[in-house]
């Protein structure tokens, strides 16, 4: 798995940004959000059980991420057409405020080292990428375990302080001073 301090790989992926088929698809690459923080999270498959709970939870926090100049990008190995069908039929995904990217060739998940070879899908990986394109946070759970988007937001807050942040630190609390 590509880790902290490494450059996030280049990518060129098609994403679903709307339920209106005429405006549904948009291309995204590593330069699309250049100069911004990115939160890139992977889920294994569309039309499953744990995945929509995570995606919807990230969607509910999108304004919080945006307020921190961070772009959410959700990714799976399903095609953009499968993403559109799922998004159009699953109530909690219908109005997602961030793109659902298709890594159908599994190039990005492979480059990051988060492709589960046995299952043929991406692991539940989350990356926070700084404005220079460097990985600053990496978090992976088992395929059966959903992650906590609130913790990802806390991690972003901590990274953006550029200070020492203790366990369970929250935005607005004191950071540590090295003595």
In which residue ranges do the predicted regions lie?
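Chalcogenol-based redox active-site neighborhoods
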Residues: 1-179
């Amino acid at each position: 798995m590509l880790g902290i301090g490494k450059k996030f790989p280049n990518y060129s992926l098609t994403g679903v940004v709307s339920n209106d088929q005429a405006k549904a698809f948009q291309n995204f690459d590593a330069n699309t959000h250049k100069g911004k923080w990115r939160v890139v999270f992977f889920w294994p498959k569309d039309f499953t059980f744990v995945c929509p709970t995570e995606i919807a939870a990230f969607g509910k926090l999108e304004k919080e991420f945006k307020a921190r100049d961070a772009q959410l990008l959700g990714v799976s190995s399903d095609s953009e057409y499968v993403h559109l069908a799922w998004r159009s039929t699953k109530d909690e995904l219908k109005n997602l405020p961030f793109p659902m990217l298709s890594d159908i060739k599994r190039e990005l998940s492979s480059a990051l080292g988060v492709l589960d070879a046995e299952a043929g899908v991406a692991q539940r990986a989350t990356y926070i990428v700084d404005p220079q394109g460097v990985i600053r946070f990496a978090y992976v759970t088992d395929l059966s375990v959903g992650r906590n988007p609130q913790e990802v937001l806390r991690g972003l807050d901590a990274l953006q302080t550029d200070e020492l942040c203790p366990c369970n630190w929250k935005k607005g609390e004191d950071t540590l001073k090295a003595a």
